[in-house]
Design a protein with these regions (language model features):
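Mature catalytic domains of secreted/periplasmic carbohydrate-active enzymes
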Residues: 1-342
Length: 342
């Protein structure tokens, strides 16, 4: 909270395709969707943010489309599969990490749990047949519940699931957090697990506890760090919470504590009127993070490249970190403009 300002770097295929979620890439190859050909100027990005007073840069290493901006050994749907960029030898996350290390900028990792592309997402047998269906239990023509097909139990569904998405996600966490070339001096201060999921997404339970243990093993006290890694979207393990809107505004009265139940793995941050207001007597400190778009979208595009005015940005500041009783951390997207990449 004392840092006040964090930058949110949204960069990936969506940057080149004028979209936000990447739900319709289908079978397009990395070369078709990731159209970067010139070298990525990470140093200018980080240096500019540092000079502007930002203390942390959170990077979307994998957004909902499933494309990885680092060279991943877990998938070919990544920057190394985009052979038009540095002959398949590029690694954008490594480039940003190197710049953050040189300029001593704290880093956060955004790794979307929802993955539109990877075939392990959801529950399917070896033939690719779905093991879970979305059904209408109220007989009103509106599907409302996911349940196993053909009378299977949930245990049988998990046994017959041909590919384990939770393992895939966990292995990618290890791949990034366990490699010293990623992060500021090999370290991430925060991991962002976005709860967004499209209406047409397959059903998938997340093994959050396993993921949290992995994160802290590398980035927390268990990994010989001074403090545990801050976690966003981590249910009862959340230590950085969403402010409740994407306007950059906190409630007039915002408290930093939430009520969590570790046994039930639930969190209550007193959500009301588009804000998470927190509680004065909650049992867990959860930094309220006020994220906002600096233009009309999270990703840059020709149709959404006009930034908000100084008056609008000033209002965001004063309605988030600018007043002592709001106590929120303000997070703005640092766009990767195609013109900046050289």
């Amino acid at each position: 909270q004392k840092q006040e300002l964090a930058a949110f770097c949204h960069f990936g295929p969506n940057t080149f395709n004028e979209i936000e979620w990447g739900e319709h890439y289908g079978d397009k190859t990395p070369n078709e969707i990731f159209k970067l050909t010139e070298d990525f100027d990470a140093d200018t990005l980080v240096k500019t943010l540092k000079e502007a007073g930002f203390k942390k840069l959170i990077v979307t290493a994998k957004h909902h489309d499933g494309f990885c901006i680092w060279a991943s050994e877990e998938t070919q749907y990544d920057v190394s599969g985009a052979t038009n960029y540095q002959g398949g030898k590029g690694d954008v996350l490594a480039d940003i990490s190197k710049a953050c290390t040189e300029h001593d900028m704290d880093m956060g990792l955004y790794l979307s749990p929802w993955d539109i592309h990877d075939e392990s997402y959801g529950y399917k047998d070896a033939s690719g047949k779905a093991l879970v269906e979305f059904v209408d239990t109220n007989n009103d023509g509106k599907p409302d519940k996911n349940q196993p097909v053909n009378g299977l139990t949930w245990e049988q569904v998990k046994q017959q699931d041909a590919k384990d998405y939770n393992k895939y996600y966990n292995d990618q966490l290890i791949e990034i957090l366990g490699n010293d070339k990623y992060g500021n001096k090999g370290h991430f201060k925060e991991v962002w697990m976005d709860g967004a999921k499209g209406s047409g997404a397959g059903y998938q339970e997340y093994d959050f506890k396993k993921w949290f243990d992995t994160i802290q093993q590398y980035e927390g006290i268990a990994g010989n760090q001074v403090d545990d890694c801050m976690l966003f979207g981590a249910e009862a393990y959340t230590t950085v919470r969403w402010i409740g809107n994407e306007n950059g505004f906190a409630a007039e009265e915002t408290w930093s504590k939430s009520n969590v139940d570790k046994e039930k793995n639930t969190i209550n941050s007193n959500s009301s009127g588009g804000y998470t207001k927190g509680f004065p007597d909650g049992n867990q400190w959860t930094v309220p993070e006020a994220d906002a778009r600096i233009t009309s979208g999270w990703f840059w595009g020709d149709s959404k490249k006009t930034p908000k005015t100084m008056e609008e940005l000033s209002e965001m500041y004063f309605r988030s970190v600018g007043k002592v009783w709001r106590k929120a951390n303000w997070m703005l997207p640092s766009f990767i403009l195609q013109e900046v990449i050289r």
